[in-house]
Amino acid sequence: MKIGIYKDTFANNRGADIAVKNLATGLSERAHAVTLFDKSEFAAKVRGEYDVIVSTGTNEILDLAKVDGLPPIVQQFHTDPNYPFRHWIKRWRRNRAIKAALKKAAAFQVLREAHIEILQKLIGVSKERITVIGNWSSFEGRAKIRTEEKIILCPGAINADKNQSLLVDAFAAVTAEFPDWQVHIYGKGKAKEEAALKKKIDSYALRDKIVLKGYVDLEEPYRRCAFVAFPSKTEGFGMVIVDAAVFSKPTLMIHDWIGCGEVADPRDFALALRRLMSDVDFRRDLGESSRIYCSANYSREKILDEWEALLSEV
């Protein structure tokens, strides 16, 4: 099969960027002719001889909808389908254009069962045109047994949505009980957002306990940590959870992502931190259960099988 995959930019190396690259590589390794192209290559490559085109986001479908004569388009959602429309009043013209463009897609891929009904309400698409397919971890097959250290790992870009400030507040509430523990935050953000997070850390005099590590490959940090804390407000799937599961590490997160993160109480998060920090057997049981579940439901081979089935049907 000849497959075009359009992603406007890979500049940020976010979870969605990684998932798209993984998909392109995986399908290529299964003998499909895959062309992955970005905004700079759009004019030259959009009219290639494809059997199907995968649109990887709402920016992408806006571009593709302007081109006539394209093959069937499969639209991806890397987040809750509501999320791109969160600024309805501020961006009403753009949002209206996105909805019109989405209706030109032949099929849709979402990350969770809960997203099906949301997408149906947004654009009136039938359930039969929506398929749930998750993501697999780039670390699959690379895990090794390591003795855990008293480190809480928090990966993700530093910004309000990733909500690292909630973790800082919660850890500050329990750190006196666990003097040997540290929080390692991996990720980068805008200078203003990084400065605000550092200021909050300094307000608790915890710079020696809460360490900003910047952006690095996370394989070794996952191996070393005791567990992962992921206080993000908005996620479609949360690749961090699947990544952590590869290493049998549990993930502490907010129960639901859209909206709940806005009102999450640091005291509740602190209670959960305390539970995990104080009980190594509990951590390991959760981590192993997560590994078993994710390996059964989000393996590379299973997800590629699901993608091949979807692409062959449109």
Model-identified regions with their sequence ranges:
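Aromatic "clamp/platform" in nucleotide-sugar-dependent glycosyltransferases that forms part
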Residues: 233
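A conserved mid-protein helix/loop that constitutes part of the nucleotide-sugar donor-binding site
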Residues: 17-22, 150, 154-173
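Short His-centered aromatic/hydrophobic patch
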Residues: 55-60, 76-78
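Glycosyltransferase donor-sugar binding loop
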Residues: 155, 182-196
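Carbohydrate-associated surface elements
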Residues: 114, 136
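Nucleotide-activated donor-binding/catalytic signature segment of Leloir-type glycosyltransferases, i.e.
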Residues: 196-214
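Membrane-proximal helix-turn-helix segments that form the acceptor-binding/catalytic region
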Residues: 90-108
